[in-house]
Amino acid sequence: MFAVIKTGGRQYRVVPDDVLEIGKIAGEVGTIVQLGEVLVLGGDTPVLGAPTVAGASIAAEVLQHKRGPKVIAFKKRRRKHSKRKRGYRDEITVLRVTEILADGKSPTIGPRPKKEKAVEPVEGASDDKPRRAAKKTAAKTAEDAD
């Protein structure tokens, strides 16, 4: 099953477990958000919206918020010794589509648990090693200043 959704003025074709980058939306990392503007539900019997499919939504997990690549806007007026350089970076939210919901259902899949990184102590890397003493510098005398 697939769906075509609209968010941030753009349209995306999504299937469950898709990872997509969209314009920034509200939501903490790791939470489930619902996107409600579903234009098409596809599958065995496709459903076209007019303009949206009633009761359909997409459940997606927020993976991260980041900034997109820098876009440079450069304007030059020839023979006028005039130019302007500006740049900006879009705010982006990375989502993983968890499920496609029809008929006003609520999400059944929660956020995925984060994997704990096991930190194992390395043998032989203890803090019992003798430390080297700091190197002492000679004090300046009046003869050195001349």
Swiss-Prot record:
Residues 116-131 have a biased composition (Basic and acidic residues). Residues 103-146 are annotated as: Disordered. Keywords: Ribonucleoprotein, Ribosomal protein, RNA-binding, rRNA-binding. SUPFAM superfamilies: L21p-like. GO terms for cellular component: cytoplasm; ribonucleoprotein complex; ribosome. This protein binds to 23S rRNA in the presence of protein L20. Belongs to the bacterial ribosomal protein bL21 family. Part of the 50S ribosomal subunit. Contacts protein L20. This is Large ribosomal subunit protein bL21. It comes from Nitrobacter winogradskyi (strain ATCC 25391 / DSM 10237 / CIP 104748 / NCIMB 11846 / Nb-255). The gene is rplU.
